[in-house]
Design a protein with these regions (language model features):
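Multi-pass alpha-helical transporter architecture, strongest
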Residues: 202-209, 354, 406-432
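Glycine-rich segments within core transmembrane alpha-helices of 12-TM secondary carriers
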Residues: 151-174, 371-383
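Extracytoplasmic gate region of multi-pass secondary transporters
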Residues: 33-34, 237-285, 379-383
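C-terminal transmembrane helical hairpin of 12-TM major facilitator-type secondary transporters
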Residues: 303-350
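Cytoplasmic membrane-interface "Motif A"-like loop-to-helix N-cap segments
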Residues: 81-93, 299-310
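Helix-loop-helix hairpin linking two adjacent transmembrane segments in secondary transporters
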Residues: 161-206
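C-terminal ends and interior cores of transmembrane alpha-helices
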Residues: 93-111, 311-327
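Central cavity-lining transmembrane alpha-helices of secondary-active solute carriers
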Residues: 59-77, 97-98, 280-293
Length: 437
């Protein structure tokens, strides 16, 4: 037997490794979103029309989501053929380098149209790399976990993204407090350049994460497929489509962290620092709430918890954006933390267990990667669509709330059509005839 099987970390260590890796990886991803909302319209897209510049800047945030489906095919294939751990290293290096290079870019004023083109290229590179992060981390966590705690351990993957968001927000709070001239000339570069440290720390941590036991066993039995994607689409197309639509709940997250920040600061004149603190506190609450929702999903099932995580934000997005429109910062904190810190965390606690459990080991990472990344690609353009729907001054918030609610309800319906899997053993996942036995 392969010696690596004897060196597999305990489920707890595997989950912590995935948590830390995801946190470090998504630090890179979220700082771009924050900069796209607050800085890039002024230094990369100075059109003379603030609304047009904001839409263009937020569109570059969405461009990475277009690259994600391409990356999902490549990295999903690699994860199901060479292993989850190898893909985790590839994604970390790709994200870290692309983000660091963004921090070195000259501005539009310095090199003209070449500046936003280079920004776009690096943003695409980010999207390609991140496409395999959550699917590989969650697959590894699921496959290491005890049968009755799979949702709990898998939930640490998305809890890690909250950690990355917290880190990114806390870095941007002092940077955002700089005088406008300092922020636009050099201050915005600091979070991007710090990604070099993030990348090296992440690589040091992930070297301790061993390959999934079931993948190692499948490899030893020579059952690893050379081409998992044809098998995926031949046997699991309905499951891939269900995951795709269920992933649309991510629209709530992107509207919360990107559109709400833009609308609150640029349109309603709320304090940039206050809004960043609201995002940070919501993510701190989510950091603790997500594993608790995962524990509940192990007791009552994935689907009931998922419904709470989709239906709740579909309702709460209305008072949240309304509070921003009223410039009531206290209510913004209350509804922001309730929506994204507590209720949306139910989705995060159940999602990757439910999605991974629709597929067997040989196509699991491909299925989750392709399904989620196509869904996230649609959701990634939510901030720019919201900016267009809201009008030139971004003041018409009702269509934005409708967009978020509609996407969350579609996700809820998709999740309800999936097979409930919390009592299905690992070897029976993705095999309906065995799951019913």
């Amino acid at each position: 037997m392969d010696d690596s099987l004897h060196r597999v970390k305990t489920p707890r260590k595997a989950a912590i490794s995935s948590w830390i890796g995801s946190a470090l990886e998504y630090y890179d991803f979220f700082i771009y979103g924050t900069a796209a909302a607050l800085v890039f319209p002024k230094i990369f897209f100075p059109t003379g029309n603030p609304a047009a510049a904001t839409i263009a800047s937020l569109a570059t945030f969405g461009v990475a989501y277009v690259a994600r489906p391409v990356g999902s095919f490549i990295l999903g294939h690699l994860g199901d053929t060479i292993g989850r751990r190898n893909v985790l290293v590839i994604t970390l290096i790709g994200m870290g380098l692309a983000t660091f290079l963004i921090g070195l870019l000259p501005t539009y004023e310095q090199i003209g149209i070449t500046a936003p083109i280079l920004l776009l290229v690096l943003r695409v590179a980010q999207g390609l790399a991140v496409a395999g992060e959550q699917s590989s981390a969650s697959s590894a966590s699921l496959e290491h976990a005890p049968e009755d705690r799979r949702a709990y351990y898998t939930s640490f993957t998305l809890a890690g993204t909250q950690g990355g968001n917290i880190l990114a927000t806390l870095v941007f709070i002092p940077v955002g407090a700089l005088p406008e001239d300092a922020l636009l000339s050099w201050g915005w570069r600091i979070p991007f350049l710090l990604s070099a440290i993030v990348m090296f720390v992440g690589l040091w941590i992930r070297r301790a994460l061993q390959e999934s036991p079931v993948f190692v066993e499948e490899k030893e039995r020579q059952e690893v497929r050379r081409a998992p994607l044809p098998v995926l689409f031949r046997s699991y197309t309905p499951e891939v489509l269900k995951v795709l639509f269920a992933a649309l709940v991510s629209v709530i997250s992107t509207l919360f962290s990107i559109y709400a920040l833009t609308y609150g600061v640029n349109t309603m004149g709320l304090s940039r620092t206050s809004m960043l603190w609201m995002v940070a506190l919501a993510n701190v609450v989510a950091l603790g709430a997500i594993p608790l929702w995962g524990m509940l999903a192990d007791r009552i099932g994935r689907k009931p918890v998922y419904v709470v995580g989709a239906l709740g934000p579909a309702i709460l997005i209305w008072p949240f954006i309304w509070a921003i429109s009223q410039q009531n910062i206290a209510l913004v904190f209350v509804f922001g933390i309730l929506q994204s810190g507590i209720v949306y965390s139910a989705y995060s606690g159940a999602a990757f267990a439910l999605w991974n459990e629709q597929f067997d080991t040989g196509v699991r990472m491909s299925g989750v990667a392709v399904g989620t990344q196509f869904g996230f690609a649609l959701g990634g353009f939510a901030p720019s669509i919201a900016a267009a729907l809201a009008g030139p001054e971004l003041e018409n918030w009702v269509p934005v709330a409708m967009l978020g609610s509609g996407a969350a309800l579609v996700a809820m319906i998709a999740a309800l059509t999936m097979r409930e899997t919390y009592r299905v053993p690992l070897e029976g996942l993705g095999k309906p005839e065995r799951a019913r036995a």
